[in-house]
Amino acid sequence: MVLSPDEELGRIVIFFLGCAFRRDREAGTIEISQESYIRSVLERFKICRTSSIPASPANDYRSVKEDEDAGDVPFREVVGSLMWIANQTRPDISNAVRAVARHSHEPKISHWKAAQKILNYLLETAHLTLKFNKEATVDVGTLVYVDADFASKATDR
């Protein structure tokens, strides 16, 4: 665990397991970010293009026999990094990561390109955080709306 001052906001930031925790007592908020970890993953896998969506809607990432093997690419390393990011602070990429992780045993070029597209999306959205606020207007517990099945299978719609 590392403590460091967040000079532009005047708050203390705690870094723990790749996550930055920012607490603002006055506003009653806690923010969790993985921007520095995401940037290190993007640098490690040499990602420089951006994407506005994590997955292509028409692609269901089935194992296509005609598709060539991905060869000697760090597919499992990328999938592991993406799973860590999705599980900690980025539920928006969970479905896309699940779709490519299914093919870790025998990745094809299309699966490698799909994993790179998720990384491209993270480059575009690395600044996003999870923000928790103590001010609740309605006491309903945690209320979340998510399209977790975005672009899963076009044939099921």
Residue ranges: model-predicted function:
Residues 1-30, 34-39:
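Acidic, low-complexity central loop/insert segments
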